[in-house]
A protein has these predicted regions:
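Active-site beta-strand->loop->alpha-helix modules in alpha/beta enzyme cores, enriched
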Residues: 1-49, 98, 106-113, 128-130
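The feature marks non-catalytic terminal segments
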Residues: 16, 21, 55-131
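Histidine/lysine/aspartate-rich catalytic loop segments that bind and position anionic ligands
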Residues: 47-57
Length: 131
């Protein structure tokens, strides 16, 4: 019942928003709620690019295969946005130093100062080659 409700909600969002990219939890996430959301997103958003993000506390074996270069302002904006989650304040896995260090690590993988890293669940696109 609950999974069907999630699927229907996602289908309604798809119709309303017509997204080009969906961000969900990585397939490496072991939290059962996160797994359910990712699985239902894969069903609801067929034909749309899906990228999985890392959750430090519940992702095991995550390695980013898609890296997006970001700058210092982006790092600060992400830290400020995450600070809005009051229920996570003070948690060891949810602090600005950890967030910044992950973005530095992903940046090193991309040979830049900072990057966001994603797991590729589905890429939909074209190479722009005309026949």
């Amino acid at each position: 019942q609950a999974r069907q409700e999630i699927l229907e909600y996602f289908l309604a969002l798809r119709e309303e928003l017509k997204p080009e990219v969906i961000f969900v939890h990585s397939n490496q996430d072991v939290h059962q709620d996160h797994q359910t959301m990712t699985q239902e997103a894969l069903r609801a958003f067929r034909g749309i690019t899906l990228l999985g993000f890392d959750v430090v506390r519940s992702s095991y074996g995550f390695f980013p295969h898609f890296l997006v270069e970001v700058d210092e302002a982006d790092v600060k904006a992400k830290i400020a946005a995450l600070a809005q989650y009051e229920t996570y304040r003070g948690k060891y896995y949810f602090n600005s130093e950890l967030t910044r260090s992950i973005m530095v690590r992903h940046g090193a993988l991309a040979e830049t100062a900072f990057a966001e890293g994603f797991d590729i669940l589905r890429i939909v696109g074209s190479f722009g080659v005309e026949a």
